[in-house]
């Protein structure tokens, strides 16, 4: 059986008011509650991007409730992509500015920003219209809060608590403008304290690996799910 998680506030799903402004952390707790209440026996968790952060939180904070984790193109601290020496403290001002800009921008500017962002995240032009529609159908405050949370949450100190196997699938494309070895080093360094980990690179893909290289991604998932 497969459980598909739809996060409130994204892609047309009604938003949930959260005074703390967190999205990933309460989602992880809600999934942990779901696993308990549905009496699921340590499911396999696959998460992409924000979902990858949620999967890491589940593995670190509820290690007995999951069997394995697949993290798809996500780091335990998002801001490392922009600054390898970043800390939560140094990331906060930039994250706040980005959040405030998202909240303040008029609709036309928001659409232009999302369109430009998606062009960097999906190499497949055919995949972009649906991604844009999902982005524009998302609650703006939820998106802004999630972005701030991702940019200021450093899960590296928690990685040592993950007791189950972890596979990190990450994208690479020459259009990134940096050598593949640099991207690999970024991921390996970020996950250095994760006990049982392996990495898989999928080439000729941007961030939305499952859309840019669907066959390669499907194979990676199938291999991962083998007992």
Describe the residue ranges of each PLM region.
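Conserved hydrolase catalytic core segment
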Residues: 41-83
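Active-site loop signature of alpha/beta-hydrolase-fold enzymes
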Residues: 10-13, 77, 208
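Alpha/beta-hydrolase
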Residues: 105-178
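Conserved loop-alpha-helix segment in the C-terminal half of the alpha/beta-hydrolase fold
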Residues: 165-206
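Catalytic histidine-centered segment of alpha/beta-hydrolase-like enzymes
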Residues: 202-214, 218
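Active-site loop/turn elements of alpha/beta-hydrolase fold enzymes
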Residues: 7-10, 74, 171-173, 204
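Flexible "cap/lid" loop of the alpha/beta hydrolase fold
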Residues: 67-105
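Active-site loop/oxyanion-hole signature of alpha/beta-hydrolase fold enzymes
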Residues: 4-46, 60
């Amino acid at each position: 059986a497969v459980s598909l998680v739809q996060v409130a506030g994204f892609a047309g799903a009604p938003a949930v008011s959260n005074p703390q402004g967190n999205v990933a952390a309460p989602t992880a707790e809600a999934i942990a509650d779901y696993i308990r209440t549905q009496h699921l026996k340590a499911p396999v968790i696959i998460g992409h991007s924000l979902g990858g952060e949620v999967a890491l939180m589940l593995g670190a904070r509820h290690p007995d409730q999951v069997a394995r984790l697949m993290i798809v193109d996500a780091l335990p601290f998002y801001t490392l992509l922009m600054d390898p020496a970043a800390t939560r403290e140094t990331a906060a001002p930039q994250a706040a500015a980005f959040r405030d800009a998202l909240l303040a921008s008029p609709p036309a500017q928001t659409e232009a920003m999302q369109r430009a962002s998606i062009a960097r995240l999906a190499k497949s032009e055919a995949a972009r219209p649906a991604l844009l529609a999902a982005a524009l159908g998302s609650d703006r405050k939820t998106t802004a809060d999630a972005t701030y949370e991702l940019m200021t949450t450093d899960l590296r100190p928690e990685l040592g608590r993950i007791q189950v196997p972890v596979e990190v699938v990450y994208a690479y494309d020459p259009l990134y403008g940096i050598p593949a070895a640099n991207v690999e080093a970024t991921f390996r360094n970020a996950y250095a304290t994760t006990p049982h980990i392996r990495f898989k690179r999928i080439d000729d893909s941007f961030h939305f690996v499952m859309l840019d290289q669907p066959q390669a991604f499907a194979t990676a998932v199938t291999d991962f799910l083998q007992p």
